[in-house]
Amino acid sequence: MKVVILAGGLGTRISEETVDKPKPMVLIDDKPILWHIMNIYALQGFADFVVATGYKGEVISEWVSTLKSPWNITPVDTGLDTQTGGRIKKCMDLYPGEKILATYGDGIGNINVKKLMKFHESHGKLATLTAVRPPARFGYLDMKNGQVIHFGEKNQSDAGWINGGYFVLEPKVSSYIHAISEPFEIGALPRLTNESELMAYEHSGFWQPMDTLREKHDLEELAREGNPPWLREI
């Protein structure tokens, strides 16, 4: 089963790291975050990857050509200005009739892909996304009449659910993407929702995007501590 990884964006919010390389090639513990994402799948038996490239895609292609790995990795140039929906569609159209796994090239977590697949197969809809809790960035205050009565750290579980990627997509999802200039989150996902064809697999475990330098440093700290949650066998 193909795993499509979206790896073509500019990474403007972490531009200090993406002047000479695409965001998925930013290093976490001496390996690109792209490697960590692929390893999440490979540890669970999914090792046939299609990497949708765009900005500085040649850096990814060169890295793949020198990588010593049992994984099957196919970089696909999906265009510099193509949006996430277009990148998914271009990759899906290369493999007509195939169900795919897909995710973003900048978010890692200890997602149980086999449980995700089982959930998808149980409901019979066209698409499943993985719903996650956004990482808590701020503490909280309880106040009464201006006096602080409790000061604490916000738990990740206190926040609502968001789209964390890690999709399962049936072949027909390609027809819900109407233009390569259309973000998947603005076009296809709302259309699928309106037709009751989108389900959410709730993941309460570890999940962390790498949108900022602070988040990169947080991931590096977890990696340096040894046995980070996304590298453990699930």
Language model features by range: what are they?
Residues M25, Y140-M143, A200:
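A structural signal for short hydrophobic beta-strand segments in well-ordered beta-sheet cores
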Residues K2-I5, R13, L27, K31-Y104, ...:
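Conserved N-terminal catalytic core of the sugar/cofactor nucleotidyltransferase
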Residues K99-L101, I108, K114-E121, R133-A136, ...:
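Catalytic-core segments of class I nucleotidyltransferases/pyrophosphorylases
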Residues G54, V76-T78, T130, Y201-H203, ...:
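Conserved beta-strand termini and adjacent loop/short-helix elements that scaffold enzyme active sites
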Residues E16-V19:
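Conserved catalytic-core motifs of eukaryotic protein kinase domains, centered on the activation segment
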Residues L10, K21, K56, P134, ...:
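A generic "binding-loop/recognition-motif" signal
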Residues Y55, T128-L141:
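Short beta-strand-to-loop element that shapes/binds the nucleotide-sugar donor at the catalytic cleft/hinge
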